[in-house]
């Protein structure tokens, strides 16, 4: 998705629901294109291939969380999702004019509260299928060096076998699916809100804890004190669970495969992919991995 195609879709979506796209700010463009309108509304334009079913589920999840008085992003009260120009778009209340991330203790509190909820059967949340996501990314390996691609394919198969043998410690249930500090922002009053509901599903709760642990332990993006507070508030340290290295490696591989999709048009991304694959191959430091 280019900025040009995203903006064209934005204009059409706004016309459909009666909003004004003038002055819209492009917040980011990646898996989705995200715009903030002059009216406090966020428009998320889905990537190629995103289904109406998945977008409907995001909106339904948001409305369920609102009914539970759970602090999460709120779906705009319009007929949505909107399917136009081959993209599925959703519209959300804008919680703030800037993206300010919540402290880790508040991230842990929202994850803990989420895990205390029981989703109604009507939501029809899917069971997490982590390797289906990796399989979607596999074609992008054709964009990297042949030896690197072969190594990553073999590593994924090894990881698949290790994952199937895991014995999870926590009771399964509803999970965010991509819980980390980047998906908990502060609203205008400084209260934390859970955002990006597109990975909501059911499954082992460890999935919602592993990224914070990974960002602390391998990337040093969080301090020891921040991680201690996270564990204290949630009540479980996923790093003490024997399966942690498997989920951590899964996340590293997923982050790297996602970046492969950008490697053709962006030499910086291509260099980062090579660096990451070498670190995975050799067990090298991840502390120089650049965020994308």
Predicted stretch roles:
Residues 206-236, 250-265:
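Active-site activation/catalytic loop segments of kinase-like enzymes and analogous catalytic loops
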Residues 30-43, 75, 161-209:
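Active-site acidic catalytic loop and adjacent metal/ATP-binding pocket
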Residues 1-21, 150, 275-292:
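Regulatory N- and C-terminal appendages and interdomain linkers associated
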Residues 138-143, 225, 257-292:
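ATP/Mg2+ or Mg2+-diphosphate-binding catalytic cores
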Residues 84-92:
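A conserved loop-to-beta-strand element in the N-lobe of protein kinase catalytic cores
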Residues 7, 44-85, 97-116:
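A conserved alpha-helical element in kinase catalytic cores
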Residues 2-10, 119-177, 235:
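An alpha-helical support segment within catalytic cores of ATP-dependent transferases
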Residues 16-37:
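ATP-binding glycine-rich phosphate-binding loop
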């Amino acid at each position: 998705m280019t900025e040009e195609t995203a903006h064209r879709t934005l204009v059409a979506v706004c016309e459909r629901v009666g909003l004004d796209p003038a002055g819209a700010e492009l917040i980011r463009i990646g898996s989705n294109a995200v715009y903030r309108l002059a009216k406090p509304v966020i428009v998320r334009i889905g990537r190629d291939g995103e289904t109406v079913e998945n977008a409907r589920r995001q909106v339904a999840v948001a409305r369920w969380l609102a009914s539970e008085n759970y602090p999460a992003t709120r779906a705009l009260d319009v007929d949505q999702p909107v399917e136009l120009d081959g993209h599925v778009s959703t519209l959300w209340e804008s919680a703030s004019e800037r993206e300010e991330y919540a402290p880790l203790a508040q991230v842990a509190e929202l994850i803990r509260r989420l895990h205390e909820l029981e989703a109604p059967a009507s939501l029809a949340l899917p069971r997490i299928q982590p390797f289906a996501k990796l399989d979607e990314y596999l074609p992008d390996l054709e964009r990297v060096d042949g030896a690197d691609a072969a190594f990553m394919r073999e590593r994924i198969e090894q990881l698949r076998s290790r994952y199937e043998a895991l014995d999870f410690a926590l009771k399964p249930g509803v999970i965010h699916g991509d819980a980390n500090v980047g998906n908990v922002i502060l609203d205008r009053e400084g209260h934390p809100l859970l955002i990006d509901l597109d990975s909501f599903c059911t499954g082992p709760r460890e999935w919602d804890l592993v990224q914070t642990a990974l960002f602390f332990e391998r990337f040093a993006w969080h301090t020891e004190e921040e991680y201690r507070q996270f564990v204290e508030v949630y009540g479980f340290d996923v790093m003490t669970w024997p399966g942690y290295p498997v989920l951590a490696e899964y996340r590293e591989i997923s982050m790297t495969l996602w970046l492969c999709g950008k490697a053709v048009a962006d030499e910086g991304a291509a260099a980062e992919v090579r660096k990451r694959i070498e670190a995975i191959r050799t067990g090298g430091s991840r502390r120089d991995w650049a965020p994308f």
